[in-house]
């Protein structure tokens, strides 16, 4: 993207990572602010964690005379400040600013929040939804919401000012056999989908695509990420977003103990 304004999308494995939208143990996301769960969730407390670009830490209130809505990260990192602001719909969201003046917005749009369906103010998670540098180059992130869970839907980048982004990464989902439920205070977050394929386009033309395949754990029945295969610009998707043809690279197989 322009001046490096492109999404940092990396697949990471954590043995304690749980059963996420890319199967057991694997993580794929752009970042989020979440409520601190270490001592149980209190929607009136200002206890938050921030994770983005491989950096993760707790948000601590900035020392006075900073306002009570300003935070710092409790670890050394690129962010000079994090602010809790009010979005257009009246709900809270966060903006982190790094040393170069680039801003990261979390949960500015309702679709990027994991929230109690009975109370829009009880937000559990704020997904990254916009990054913008000092020169006005930006990317936007949209989400698909299903059973209170949010999934990456589209990352659009290489936008500037009033120029809309030219590059779009689209994430296609499929139903999973091993639905996961997370109980947070007052509501339930159900992960009933998993990543199926990814479509990368520039100026409305396909650049490449990826197909994701899973196995089921013989012991637990959970989704195990088996392989990811890259296809060229000639990739063809069927109606359910499986790639049916195209120039394929050898699949990257991900064997691990399950």
Place the predicted regions along the sequence by residue.
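Conserved catalytic cores of ATP-dependent inositol ring kinases
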Residues: 1-258
């Amino acid at each position: 993207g322009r001046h490096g304004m492109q999404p940092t999308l990396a697949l990471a494995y954590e043995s304690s990572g749980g059963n996420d939208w890319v199967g057991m143990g694997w993580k794929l996301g752009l970042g989020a602010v979440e409520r601190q769960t270490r001592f149980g969730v209190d929607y009136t407390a200002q206890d938050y964690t921030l994770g983005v670009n491989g950096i993760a830490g707790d948000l601590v209130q900035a020392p006075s005379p900073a306002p009570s809505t300003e935070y710092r990260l409790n670890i050394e990192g690129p962010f000079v400040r994090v602010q809790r602001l009010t979005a257009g719909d009246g709900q809270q969201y966060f903006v982190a600013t790094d040393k170069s003046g680039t801003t990261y917005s979390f949960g500015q749009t309702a679709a990027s929040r994991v929230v109690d369906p009975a109370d829009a103010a009880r937000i559990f998670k704020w997904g990254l939804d916009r990054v913008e540098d000092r020169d006005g180059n930006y990317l936007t992130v949209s989400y698909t919401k299903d059973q209170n869970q949010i999934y990456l839907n589209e990352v659009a980048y290489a936008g500037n000012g009033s120029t809309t982004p030219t590059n779009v990464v689209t994430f296609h989902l499929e139903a999973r056999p091993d639905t996961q439920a997370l109980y947070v205070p007052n509501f339930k977050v159900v992960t009933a989908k998993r990543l199926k394929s990814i479509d990368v386009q520039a100026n409305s033309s396909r650049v490449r695509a990826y197909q994701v395949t899973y196995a089921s754990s013989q012991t637990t029945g959970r989704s195990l990420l088996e392989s990811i295969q890259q296809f060229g610009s000639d990739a063809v998707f069927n109606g359910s977003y499986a790639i049916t043809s195209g120039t394929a690279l050898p699949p990257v197989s991900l064997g691990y103990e399950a």
